[in-house]
């Protein structure tokens, strides 16, 4: 059955496969899972992928960025200070990427995050720090990608420029383009934007030899995806994909946070919903409790001094049981099953044909989720891959394939949503149906003029599954101009859709009579312009320079502290160094300490003070060593003379 299907698929997707394998990538290729809550990076070691540890020693890095004065913090450092700096600490920004400000999901998020979300000049949703400076979601994502790039470079010992970046399978065109923009801003050449479940399937099936049909259930920090894939003879073919780009661990945290807020209000009468710092503490406590309830039946939530009233300090103290949390999250778990049903239907497979259900994403550790998946698919899910690392491992594997380091593996992915144009009467005419294997290209001639002597035609591109164009998401629009005057309906306009392996779409309109063409790359009706991306790259580079200078100053401070401590210890141990020399060291030590305490000291100034101290200590150390050696030599000589005298006396006595 599998071989027959794949032979058919192979013939249908021959052009796609040829384009997919058309060019070999040179240089290192890293795989990055840019997650909503956590991100990680992997590289190929030989024929096996490996997830790398960051500078803090962890394999997963919080997808959190903060601004504190002129300082930019990324990862764990940013997350640790979120409670005291909630308005300038950005988390879960991936949920905003490629979205318009008026999007209903954005309006929902505005009420639930401590930082501000505002409308940018192009109409997209951007975040804003406490000083009023706006950042695009792509820019914030770029700061996280820079951290991943740095992690890989530290491990490899060389610069890295190529990356495979994963994204939710149900991301639309603008969201994929925004993800690629984030990589560009971070200084990366994003050679593929690959669906997370597809990457996880690569990690799962890399060492599998048996033909199989699998489902990948990916419930992460901010998004949910379900994909059905067929694996046979090294070919990974995605049959169908579905999902919800606004369902994930953040929503589970939120439902538990709301419960804590409600219970606290019941017991104290105090509403904390408008207190940003308190909300951030509760959110962090909810996330911690959620994780603990995956392995324990109940957990304590204790937040001392959360607020105060006329009765004094108030504290959050409560016990949350697993059953209570599961009842709060029941609707969220059930929401994931709707896309599962649609995906199975679109893949045209029976549940009995699914031989394995692979769980991916941190939320799949929740017992309620595991049970729901088991009941839906009728089998115990496979939990043999690390749910936090599988996607990055798959990304690195795909990088190995593109470098031709990994042989005999082919990936055939799909576009998650239908793409088409608006035609007469506002109808949505599909050009590329959903779940079409990509890359793909399709042309169709159905446009013409609607009026006599009309010289231009407007093309509106939409993505979605509704029958009327207005009910779907408009991805972009452009005009084909210079059409020769002719009666209505005579000119023939050919429209071509061309989707890259990344899932990014290019649309071209051509007047068949004159050969004139006009094209557009689908980014978004807003999206980042080339100038904005270049400005953000410069901004990123300036941050990189300031970060480098800051790191160098920290290293110089650490060295100064070490030298100062050494000098203080030596001053108490020297026996042969003169008082004048000791006083000189004390003077230089005081100068070094003063420089260290100066918040505005430069690296060169502190280095100079440290070098003077170090040089003086070394001179005194040399004096100490020489004087001590001379003293030992004199003592040894005296002992030798005495011994010789005793031996002579003993000899005289023996002669007598």
UniProtKB/Swiss-Prot annotation:
Residues 1-23 form a transit peptide. GO terms for biological process: DNA replication. Its main location: mitochondrion. Residues 626-656 have a biased composition (Low complexity). One of its GO terms (cellular component) is kinetoplast. Residues 624-656 are annotated as: Disordered. PROSITE patterns: HSP70_1, HSP70_2, HSP70_3. It is found in: Mitochondrion matrix, Kinetoplast. It holds the Pfam family HSP70. GO terms for molecular function: ATP binding; ATP-dependent protein folding chaperone; unfolded protein binding. Keywords: ATP-binding, DNA replication, Kinetoplast, Mitochondrion, Nucleotide-binding, Stress response, Transit peptide. Belongs to the heat shock protein 70 family. May participate in eukaryotic mitochondrial DNA replication. This is Heat shock 70 kDa protein, mitochondrial. It comes from Trypanosoma cruzi. The gene is MTP70.
């Amino acid at each position: 059955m599998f071989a027959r299907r794949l032979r058919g698929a192979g013939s249908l997707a021959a052009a796609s496969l040829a384009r997919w394998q058309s060019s070999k990538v040179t240089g290192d290729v890293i795989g990055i899972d840019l997650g909503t809550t956590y991100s990680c990076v992997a590289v190929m070691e030989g024929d096996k992928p490996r997830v790398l540890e960051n500078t803090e020693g962890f394999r997963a890095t919080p997808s959190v960025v903060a601004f504190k004065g002129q300082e930019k913090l990324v990862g764990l450092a940013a997350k640790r200070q979120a409670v005291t700096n909630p308005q300038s600490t950005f988390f879960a920004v991936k949920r905003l990427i490629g979205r318009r400000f008026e999007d209903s999901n954005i309006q929902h998020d505005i009420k639930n995050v401590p930082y501000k979300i505002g409308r940018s000049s192009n109409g997209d949703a951007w975040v804003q720090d406490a000083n009023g400076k706006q950042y695009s979601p792509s820019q914030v994502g770029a700061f996280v990608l820079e951290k991943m790039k740095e992690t890989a470079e530290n491990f490899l010992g060389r610069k890295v420029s190529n990356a495979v970046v994963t994204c939710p399978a149900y991301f639309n065109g603008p969201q994929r383009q925004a993800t690629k923009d984030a990589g560009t801003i971070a200084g990366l050449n994003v050679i593929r934007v690959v669906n997370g479940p597809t990457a996880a399937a690569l990690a799962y099936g890399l060492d599998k030899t048996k033909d199989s049909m699998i489902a990948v259930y990916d419930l992460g920090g901010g998004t949910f995806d379900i994909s059905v894939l067929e694996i046979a003879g090294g070919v990974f073919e995605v049959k169908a994909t579905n999902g919800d780009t606004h369902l994930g661990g953040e929503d589970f945290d939120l439902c538990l946070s709301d419960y804590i807020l409600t219970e606290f209000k019941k017991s104290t009468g105090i509403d904390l919903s408008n207190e940003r710092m308190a909300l951030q503490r509760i959110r962090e406590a909810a996330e911690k409790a959620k994780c603990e309830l995956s392995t324990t039946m109940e957990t304590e939530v204790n937040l001392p001094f959360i607020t105060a009233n006329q009765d004094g300090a108030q504290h959050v103290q409560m016990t949350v049981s697993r059953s209570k949390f599961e009842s709060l999250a029941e609707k969220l778990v059930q929401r994931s099953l709707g896309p599962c049903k649609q995906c199975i239907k679109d893949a045209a497979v029976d549940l009995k044909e699914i031989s394995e259900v692979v769980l991916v994403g941190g939320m799949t550790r929740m017992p309620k989720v595991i049970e729901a998946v088991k009941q839906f698919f009728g089998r115990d899910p496979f939990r043999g891959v690390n749910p936090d690392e599988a996607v990055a491992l798959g990304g690195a594997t795909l990088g190995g394939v593109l470098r031709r380091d990994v042989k005999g593996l082919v990936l055939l992915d799909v576009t998650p949503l239908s793409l088409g144009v608006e035609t007469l009467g506002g109808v949505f005419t599909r050009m590329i149906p959903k779940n079409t294997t990509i890359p793909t290209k399709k042309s169709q001639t159905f446009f013409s003029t609607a009026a006599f002597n009309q010289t231009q035609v407007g093309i509106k591109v939409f993505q979605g599954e509704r029958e009327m164009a207005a009910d779907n998401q408009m991805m972009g629009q452009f005009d084909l101009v210079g059409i020769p005057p002719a009666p209505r309906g005579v000119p023939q306009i050919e429209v071509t859709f061309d989707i890259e392996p990344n899932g990014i779409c290019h649309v071209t309109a051509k007047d068949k009579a004159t050969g004139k063409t006009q094209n557009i790359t689908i980014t978004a009706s807003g999206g980042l312009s080339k100038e904005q991306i270049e400005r953000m790259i410069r901004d990123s580079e300036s941050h990189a320079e300031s970060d480098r200078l800051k790191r160098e100053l920290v290293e110089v401070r650490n060295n100064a502290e070490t030298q100062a401590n050494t000098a203080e210890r030596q001053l108490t141990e020297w026996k042969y160094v003169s008082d004048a020399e000791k006083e000189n060291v004390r003077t230089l030590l005081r100068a070094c300490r003063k420089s260290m305490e100066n918040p505005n000291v430069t690296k060169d100034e502190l280095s100079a003070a440290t070098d003077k101290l170090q040089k003086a200590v070394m001179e005194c150390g040399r004096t100490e060593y020489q004087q001590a050696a001379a003293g030992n030599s004199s003592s040894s000589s005296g002992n030798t003379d005495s011994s010789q005298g005793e031996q002579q006396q003993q000899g005289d006595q023996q002669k007598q």
